[in-house]
Design a protein with these regions (language model features):
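Transmembrane beta-barrel domains of Gram-negative outer membranes and organellar outer membranes
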Residues: 1-249
Length: 249
């Protein structure tokens, strides 16, 4: 099999696919996000448990993904504490394809590059106040370059087709990110990431986050990660810590 390359935990997907005939589970064991107060002083907290991306290798350079989000909870806190609400349930089902144009089998020496494309669609499951109520989708274009034997840079641009808050139409949101990854030892690595989202309908403006984390790979098919994203702009979540697990079979 090829080198173990999970997409998590950063927001930047990589261009590499899972080997044909193999399955990879990438899970958020726990994921928490805390928003900044909006114009009305409302704060939103989100709790995710067991959100899992199932990646299935189809051919040498193609895979299918199914993002399952069974246990999500949202707490909305208003200025009046008595008005605090809780909503809980499954989120949307995301179905994704990934195609590697090149680099799957040649990303070994410094200077090597890889390129892929990742189209996806979000399908509402239940109307419970947690997930979206409309079909949405988009496409990612991930790129990676190997800087040295221990470091690589991953870049991604994404176009999201999002349902308008008002009316029946859709608009395009633009997500871009870059993640610098460094191998500390044969089992431990880390990353630093900058991500932006513009074209969103939030009156506070665009979203900018900085993320970092620590990754532990006890063997060539398992990864445990812990980290957090930190919001820079007013529209960004204030903090987003997480703990995750990836396993390849």
């Amino acid at each position: 099999m090829r080198e173990f390359e999970p997409d998590r935990p950063d927001l930047t997907n990589n261009p590499f696919t899972v080997d044909a005939g193999h399955v990879q589970f990438e899970s958020d064991l726990f994921n928490y996000s805390l928003s900044r107060p909006d114009q009305d002083g409302t704060v939103t907290e989100k709790f995710l448990f067991g959100s899992t991306n199932v990646r299935v290798g189809i051919t040498n350079n193609t895979e299918l993904q199914f993002l399952l989000q069974p246990i999500n909870a949202v707490r909305t806190r208003f200025k009046n504490p008595a008005m605090t609400t809780w909503d809980a349930g499954p989120d949307v089902l995301e179905i994704t394809g990934k195609y590697n144009f090149y680099g799957n089998d040649t990303f070994e020496k410094p200077g090597s590059t890889a390129l892929g494309v990742i189209p996806f669609i979000d399908i509402p499951t239940v109307h419970n106040g947690v997930g979206e109520d409309h079909v949405q989708g988009g496409v990612d274009v991930p790129f990676a370059i190997k800087l040295s034997d221990k470091a690589e840079l991953e870049l991604m641009t994404e176009y999201d087709f999002i349902k308008n808050n008002q009316g029946s139409g859709y608009h395009v949101e633009y997500f871009n990110s870059g993640s610098f990854e460094y191998e500390i030892t044969s089992k431990f690595s880390t990353y630093v990431e900058v991500a932006t989202l513009f074209g969103n309908e939030d009156p506070s403006g665009g979203i900018v986050t900085i993320g970092t984390g620590l990754l532990y790979q006890p063997n060539g098919n398992t990864q445990i990660d812990v980290g957090s994203n930190f919001g820079v702009t007013r529209a960004s979540d204030r903090i987003n810590p997480f703990v995750g697990l990836t396993k390849r079979f």
